[in-house]
């Protein structure tokens, strides 16, 4: 389309749009936000709104779609939720005063990582992440624009970056360096992230400070630059970037957290059925967010853990006071989000009223905490700043019945501003004067139905029906003629109306100005409000953990430095809650200081996975400061939990079950320390039997000899139980069963020693497989059990003297009439797996599989 054929208004649109090619441009035109060209076509499909055209009679009509400005937020939410950016172009001058095209500018770009306003409020954090790279090191910074939280760290490799992004549940990543194509594919295709480029930094000494490393400062400044470039305003609520290190917390990958159902149920993706669901008895949005953080990042500093435990104990010891505290927290609104709305200049009267109500609750909360009379609460009490001067300002300035908008009036309390009160008096007395005029003229004219009405076009007028027109006084002048009546005015009525309209206009302007000044004063308190929010959130989380501990009969864990695990009659917190206390069978877990590995055998569906998850959840709960479901708990402080639980293929990246198993095993073996916890469930089942058994044995021995981490290893390879003869730090345990009259009952109880049967056929029977099939399986099993697999004991790991799996066939069966040993077996025996990395083992096994 030739440029000369484009109207000035559309040229303005195109000039703005070229600066935001990756965003939907919402172009304000009167009472609507309009979209044009491809934006209109796509938005019409996504939002299910009408697609029209701006110039229907032209050869190439311009596609157009629009949404009302007063309901635009809901449409913006849909676009952003689907991963799009939305640029908002507002009218920057009154169209009535404009000369030519109304001036318009983009005032904000809303992206998935920068959502502040939403028609669907969510108490969860919405983190925007930035990544940068110098040499082989990665910098990562993240921020919640809606709360002001701001952090930065350094990471060793790209896999750690991806894991942290997943842990943060980020939807958008700002990239500050040239990504490798393969890395970009991982972020976009596997992690489903929106990527934005930012190569410039935003220099702000107040927010970046000097506590960060150079790389952390670089990535944090690029994140800050992106936020300022999209939000286009000063954001006084942003907090100073805080340095953190992954090792400061109990390290867990996203896959580990998912397999343990920490924040959501892995099967449903919902909160219900997760540890978060179980522990969440918070009463505030801030408390809920902080609880998620505590679950997501348990502590490794024992003193900090005990500090939390001490406060929970105080709450447990004072039931009635705690109940009062819980009740008082219900009156607390989301201070962090309210502060951000003030900073964005979007806080309305209702927001300030909520803030005022919250501040009024603080002295009550503080008094209750003081009534506990315990030194454990002294730190929290110091942080509970009630801000009485701010509470007084809001209470005296804002009418408690004020509307949500700032243009309708009725915002400021009577008595707050003398001039405003005068205008209101004129309006109030004017109404009384009008009533007096109406009564006077009704009596003088004899028109019994005479009344004064008002509309925006005619102002105040006397309404006279046609039947009474002959009685209209001479000093009335006609303002409008209708079918059945006429409207009249008088000089006296016009004078009163003029005074009232002037007072109303001045009152409205003054009230708006007063509200803006009050909001500016509130903004000065943002730092103190954010500190108060953190203190209240901490109180809320600790009372929530106390309530959960009391309700579910949890105990306070203790910690030791001898690498002992002693959990007496422990329970899986979530499974117990779902099943009911009466149905759940507790299990004792014991690792003395010399025991590092429990090799767990037993039938499928018998409770092996629950038993292992029980330990992992107990560690998470203990190190976040919570109490634990058991009769007693004594644990070391772990630095990390590594898991391989479940056998789902990674279909997105094309990785098989076996590949995923080996990669997760490799991560554990490479990174675990003697202070780590490893949970491996049926490792090796993703490949052929002997491949899997060989790898399982080699991994067990590697952990035993070189890693030394506390490990639970569940396996269906019963032959591996013989390892207890050669590995001094390994013990066998199994799930007990009861056989009676041919029926098998799983007791869900862990006992010492190896299992003697797998009971797989019994599980198949429970699943409902046909009887004929089960009988045939039983026959085949009897024949197969004639084979024995002997794992040679190992006294020393070396390339000259290493264990090997040898198969001795004691009985030929019909399934294998022509059995001959495959030469690949000898190659397998020759593998020097004890001097190979897990990844090398995996590649070697893959090569051998190709030869089969």
From Swiss-Prot:
It comes from the Bacteria. One of its GO terms (biological process) is mismatch repair. Transmembrane segments: none annotated. GO terms for molecular function: ATP binding; ATP-dependent DNA damage sensor activity; damaged DNA binding; mismatched DNA binding. ATP binds at residues 602-609. Gene3D superfamilies: 1.10.1420.10, DNA repair protein MutS, domain I (3.40.1170.10), MutS, connector domain (3.30.420.110), P-loop containing nucleotide triphosphate hydrolases (3.40.50.300). Keywords: ATP-binding, DNA damage, DNA repair, DNA-binding, Nucleotide-binding. One of its GO terms (cellular component) is cytosol. PROSITE patterns: DNA_MISMATCH_REPAIR_2. SMART domains: MUTSac, MUTSd. Belongs to the DNA mismatch repair MutS family. This protein is involved in the repair of mismatches in DNA. It is possible that it carries out the mismatch recognition step. This protein has a weak ATPase activity. This is DNA mismatch repair protein MutS. It comes from Streptococcus thermophilus (strain ATCC BAA-491 / LMD-9).
């Amino acid at each position: 389309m030739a440029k000369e054929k484009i109207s000035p208004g559309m040229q303005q649109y195109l000039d703005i749009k070229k600066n935001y090619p990756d965003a939907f441009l919402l172009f304000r035109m009167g009472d609507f936000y309009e979209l044009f060209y491809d934006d209109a076509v796509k938005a019409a499909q996504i939002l299910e709104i009408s697609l029209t055209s701006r110039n229907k009679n032209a050869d190439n009509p311009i596609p157009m779609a629009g949404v009302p400005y007063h309901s635009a937020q809901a449409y913006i939410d849909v676009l952003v939720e689907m991963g799009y950016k939305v640029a908002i172009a507002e009218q920057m001058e009154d169209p009535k005063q404009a000369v030519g095209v109304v001036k318009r500018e983009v005032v904000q770009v809303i992206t998935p990582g920068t959502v502040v306003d939403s028609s669907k409020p969510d108490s969860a954090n919405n983190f925007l992440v930035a990544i940068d790279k110098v040499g082989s090191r990665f910098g990562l910074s993240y921020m919640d624009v809606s709360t002001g939280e701001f952090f930065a760290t350094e990471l060793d490799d790209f896999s750690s970056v991806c894991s942290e992004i997943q842990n943060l549940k980020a939807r958008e990543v700002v990239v500050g360096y040239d990504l490798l194509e393969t890395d970009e594919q991982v972020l976009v295709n596997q992690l489903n992230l929106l990527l934005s480029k930012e190569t410039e930094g935003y220099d702000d000494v107040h927010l970046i400070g000097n506590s960060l490393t150079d790389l952390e400062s670089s990535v944090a400044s690029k994140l800050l630059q992106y936020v300022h470039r999209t939000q286009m305003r000063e954001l006084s609520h942003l907090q100073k970037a805080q340095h953190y290190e992954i090792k400061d917390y109990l390290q867990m990958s996203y896959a580990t957290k998912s397999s343990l159902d920490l924040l959501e149920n892995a099967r449903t993706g919902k909160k219900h059925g997760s540890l978060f669901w179980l522990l969440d008895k918070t009463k505030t949005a801030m408390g809920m967010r902080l609880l998620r953080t505590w679950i997501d990042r348990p502590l490794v500093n024992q003193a900090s853990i005990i500090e939390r435990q001490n406060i929970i104990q105080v709450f447990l010891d004072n039931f009635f006071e705690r109940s009062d505290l819980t009740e008082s927290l219900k009156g607390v609104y989301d201070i962090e989000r309210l502060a951000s709305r003030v900073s964005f200049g979007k806080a309305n009267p209702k927001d300030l009223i909520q803030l005022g109500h919250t501040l009024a609750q603080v002295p009550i909360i503080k008094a209750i905490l003081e009534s506990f009379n315990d030194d454990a609460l002294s730190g929290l009490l110091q942080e509970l700043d009630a801000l009485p001067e701010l509470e007084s300002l809001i209470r005296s300035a804002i009418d408690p019945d004020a509307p949500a908008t700032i243009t309708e009036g009725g915002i400021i309390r009577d008595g707050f501003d003398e001039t405003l009160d005068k205008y209101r008096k004129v309006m109030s007395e004017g109404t009384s004067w009008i009533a007096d005029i109406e009564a006077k003229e009704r009596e003088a004219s004899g028109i019994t139905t005479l009344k004064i009405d008002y509309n925006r076009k005619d102002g105040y007028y006397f309404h006279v029906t046609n039947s009474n027109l002959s009685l209209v006084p001479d000093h009335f002048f006609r303002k409008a003629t209708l079918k059945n009546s006429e409207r009249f005015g008088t000089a006296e009525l016009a004078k009163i109306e003029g005074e009232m309209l002037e007072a109303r206009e001045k009152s409205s302007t003054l009230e708006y100005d007063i509200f803006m000044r009050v909001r500016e004063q509130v903004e000065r308190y943002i730092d103190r409000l954010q500190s108060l929010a953190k203190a209240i959130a901490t109180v809320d989380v600790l009372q929530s953990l106390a309530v959960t501990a009391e309700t579910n009969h949890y105990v306070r864990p203790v910690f030791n430095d001898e690498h002992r695990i002693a959990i007496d009659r422990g329970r899986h917190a979530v499974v117990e809650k779902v099943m009911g206390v009466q149905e759940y069978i507790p299990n004792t877990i014991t690792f003395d200081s010399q025991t590092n590995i429990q090799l767990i055998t037993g039938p499928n569906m018998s409770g092996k996975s629950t038993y292992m998850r029980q330990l992992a959840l107990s560690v998470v709960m203990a190190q976040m400061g919570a109490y634990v479901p058991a009769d007693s708990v004594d644990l070391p402080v772990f630095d990390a939990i590594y898991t391989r639980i479940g056998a789902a293929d990674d279909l997105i990246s094309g990785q098989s079950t076996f590949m995923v198993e080996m990669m997760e095993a490799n991560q554990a073996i490479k990174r675990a320390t003697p202070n780590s916890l490893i949970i491996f469930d049926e490792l090796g089942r993703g490949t052929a039997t002997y491949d899997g058994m060989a790898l399982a044995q080699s991994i067990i021995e590697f952990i035993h000899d070189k890693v030394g981490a506390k490990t639970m290893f569940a396996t269906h390879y019963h032959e591996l139980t013989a390892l207890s003869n050669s590995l001094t730090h390994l013990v066998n345990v199994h799930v007990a069963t009861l056989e009676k009259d041919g029926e098998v009952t799983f007791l869900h109880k862990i006992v010492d020693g190896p299992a003697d049967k797998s009971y797989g056929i019994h599980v198949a029977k429970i699943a409902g497989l046909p009887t004929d099939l089960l009988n045939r399986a039983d026959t085949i099993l009897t024949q197969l059990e004639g084979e024995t697999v002997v794992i040679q004991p190992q006294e020393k790991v070396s390339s000259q003297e290493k264990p090997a799996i040898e198969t001795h066939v004691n009985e030929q069966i019909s399934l294998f009439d022509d059995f001959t040993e495959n030469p690949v077996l000898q190659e397998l025996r020759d593998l020097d797996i004890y001097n190979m990395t897990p990844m090398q083992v995996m590649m070697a096994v893959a090569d051998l599989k190709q030869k089969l």
